[in-house]
Amino acid sequence: MKKLLLITIIVHFIFQLTIAQKTKLDTLLFELPDVVFTKIKTTENFAATYELRIKQPVDHSDATKGHFYQRAYLSHKGFDRPTVMMTEGYDRPQIRISELTEFIKGNQILIEHRYFGESMPDSLDYNYLTLKQVTGDLHRINTIFRQIYKNKWLSTGISKGGATTLFYRYFYPDDVDVSVNYVGPINNAFEDQRIYKFLDTVGTKACRDKINSFQRYLLKNKKEILPLIKAYSLGAKLKFTYHNLEKAFEFAVMEYPFSFWQYGYNCADIPVKALSPFEAVTYFTSVSDISFFSDEQVAGYGSHYYQSATEFGYYGYETAEFKGLLNELSTEQNPHATFLPNKMKAAFDPKLLNEINTWLPKQGNKIIHIYGTLDTWSATAVPPSNSVDALWFFIEGKHHGNARIKAMSLKEKAKLTTALERWLAIKIDND
């Protein structure tokens, strides 16, 4: 009886504490400048969840240039917990909780990237889509929410979001105590040559030969395959005016090796025997979908392509060996994989890449880099350095979609946990 009473009292106390935290948090949010918030369904294992709209200047150095509202999501665990900023690289139409947030049992602010989704100015002036402005958005959010969360702060992101976390740390090294970069590349040029070396050496020669043979099959049998691609595109309601259908198809064939390794597809699944055009297209679209080169997706990733063409750097396609098989793509120079909005012209400036590639190995402390050995983007991973207090994990056999803490060995996970506990001065219990 006493035990039941004690349990009842504890449950009641926790319930009342949760209600009190929600009420206090509502009050504190009302007091924040330039933040509009709406309560949404509470995320599991959190006390409260909100969708936010945060007023941001288009130009952080000149408020007269106008403003926009940046979409974000707040998941509240407790005022005494660390806070994780999850930096997205693209749009974020719905909430998600990062692995890192769950791992340390923290609060989370999930932030949609400027010029994506609903985080758009009334008119898109791409002159203000720079990493300095992007990280200025993050700094402003950090400054505002530090009025509520006064414990340790972390930032994390996946892929382009991971790279954004690193650029944020470069521009504002004191905003967070720890950064965790998942599979985020830091390129070194407009066309990073390391991608080609990776694709020429990853896996086994037999597998790479199968990939190449399949590409050649697709191109040699274009007459039979293109009608199937057209039928597939009509069914999927895809439009091709930025690229015509044949050009989009050739791009998708060139993209195939990159996509194959990026997401760790199985060499045994590459169709080679008794191959029919229908079988080829069915498999091909499951790995390198032509929709990626359709008008809708080219437009949807327009801001990403602009960033890649001006500051981030990116990759291209080595086409010389396919001379005679490509009609739409050049085989005299490598076609680049950036497709700028409205086919606008933009100049690449290598200055920032040079700066961050110098800064990371010398001053990139308290950063954890997590990559998968199969992932094509591991080719442009931040190189390990003994000159900084940082950690690198290249998880064997993992790719862009599953190189995560949960995929680590017990030894790797213990190493990561020890570093986080040391840097954050907390105890992490994930038994």
Residue map of PLM features:
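A catalytic-pocket lid/entrance helix-loop region that shapes and gates access to the active site
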Residues: 176-236
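Short glycine-enriched nucleophile-adjacent loop
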Residues: 162-174, 179, 186
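Alpha/beta-hydrolase fold nucleophile elbow
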Residues: 149-159
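Alpha/beta-hydrolase fold active-site neighborhood
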Residues: 233-348
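Bacterial Sec-dependent N-terminal signal peptides
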Residues: 1-27, 199-210
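Conserved alpha/beta-hydrolase
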Residues: 102-121
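Alpha/beta-hydrolase active-site loop
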Residues: 128-147
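Catalytic-loop region of hydrolases
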Residues: 20-107, 411, 418, 422-431
